[in-house]
């Protein structure tokens, strides 16, 4: 039996200025889809995401944390990459979404049209910026048990995700996260502040719930035609209701369970369609030893995207008997 292909889509924290720029310059399918989606964003809200994303004054090292731009930019880059892969004959047998990446997974699997998915992302960014106070998200490289054992973490943050045995993310108010960072620094526990201005997957976004649910109720949601595995539940979704797209903002991210669910069915080839290769890095820690060859990333801050894309195409389409 052919090895199934699984596309993985990551969320906030994986973005950076100039992401996908090499593909935009050299891959016609990626560029055209990005332009089409940007036209939709301009028509919907009056501003170009691409102009912000690829502005020459915005350096790779600058934090890309303006939600009105970073939210749609992540979706656009992920969906355009999935489209470019499909145009080369590389089509997913499953999709896995994580946090904001659930929208790209939903669009690729047919749950939402690409335009509706982008509209949901744009509206979510607008509502969150208008109704929610700022917050922070912090990745911690340590045993997730630390969250329960350290009173400072448990009392002043919420657990946003456990990504693998030594990596988890918390959300909280900015001043609380700063205190936690000081404490972690004293204890020499590695950590990284994510380029996110709001505390997703925590009570800090609760003010957005009702207006966003009213907006979601207007959307046409379909049954996926490609199996869709969600990190909101850690399993396959078949009967998706509108409120699901609020849950992916508010509930903890269960990517580890989602990946294990997928791999327990059949050992797949996992292609990270996110901007940073974040989920590919997580997958190498989650799946059994010897699985690294089944895990690929294309976009990274170090570029070489065309090379990575060609390597994947060669490995998938070249062997005899592999379906196109």
UniProtKB/Swiss-Prot annotation:
Compartments where found: Cytoplasm
TM stretches of this protein: none
InterPro entries the record matches: Ac_transferase_dom_sf, Acyl_transferase_dom, Acyl_Trfase/lysoPLipase, Malonyl_transacylase_ACP-bd, Polyketide_Synthase
Keyword Cell inner membrane belongs to the record: no
One GO location term (cellular component): cytoplasm
Domain of life: Bacteria
Location of the active site: 99
Pathway involvement of the protein, from the record: Antibiotic biosynthesis; bacillaene biosynthesis
Keyword annotations of the record: Acyltransferase, Antibiotic biosynthesis, Cytoplasm, Transferase
GO molecular function: acyltransferase activity
Record EC number: 2.3.1.-
Function of the molecule: Probably involved in some intermediate steps for the synthesis of the antibiotic polyketide bacillaene which is involved in secondary metabolism.
PANTHER family per record: POLYKETIDE SYNTHASE 37, POLYKETIDE SYNTHASE 44-RELATED
Protein's UniProt name: Polyketide biosynthesis acyltransferase homolog BaeD
Organism: Bacillus velezensis (strain DSM 23117 / BGSC 10A6 / LMG 26770 / FZB42)
Classification of source organism: Bacteria, Bacillati, Bacillota, Bacilli, Bacillales
């Amino acid at each position: 039996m052919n090895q199934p292909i699984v596309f993985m889509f990551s969320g906030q924290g994986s973005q950076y200025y100039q992401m996908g720029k090499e593909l935009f310059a050299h891959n016609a399918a990626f560029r055209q889809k990005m332009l089409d989606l940007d036209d939709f964003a301009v028509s919907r809200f009056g501003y170009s995401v691409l102009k912000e994303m690829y502005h020459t004054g915005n350096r790779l090292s600058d934090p890309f944390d303006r939600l009105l731009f970073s939210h749609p930019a992540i979706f656009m880059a992920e969906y355009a990459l999935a489209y470019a892969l499909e145009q080369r004959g590389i089509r997913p047998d499953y999709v896995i979404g994580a946090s904001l990446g659930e929208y790209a997974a939903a669009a690729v699997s047919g749950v939402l049209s690409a335009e509706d998915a982008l509209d949901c992302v744009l509206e979510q960014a607008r509502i969150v910026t208008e109704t929610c106070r700022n917050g922070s998200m912090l990745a911690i490289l340590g045993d997730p048990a630390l969250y329960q054992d350290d009173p400072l973490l448990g009392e002043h943050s919420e657990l946003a995700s456990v990504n693998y045995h030594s990596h988890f993310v918390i959300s909280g108010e900015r001043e609380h996260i700063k205190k936690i960072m000081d404490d972690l620094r004293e204890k020499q526990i590695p950590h990284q502040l994510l380029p996110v201005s709001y505390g997703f997957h925590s009570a800090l976004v609760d003010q957005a719930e009702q207006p966003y649910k009213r907006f979601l109720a207007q959307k046409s949601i379909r049954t996926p035609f490609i199996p869709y595995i969600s990190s909101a539940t850690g399993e396959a979704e078949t009967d998706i209701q509108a409120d699901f797209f609020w849950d992916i903002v508010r509930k903890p991210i269960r990517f580890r369970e989602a990946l294990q669910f997928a791999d327990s069915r059949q050992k797949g080839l996992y292609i990270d369609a996110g901007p940073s290769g974040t989920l590919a890095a997580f997958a190498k820690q989650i799946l059994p030893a010897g699985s690294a060859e089944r895990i690929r990333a294309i976009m990274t801050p170090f570029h070489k995207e065309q090379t990575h894309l060609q390597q994947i195409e060669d490995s998938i389409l070249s062997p005899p008997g592999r379906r196109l």
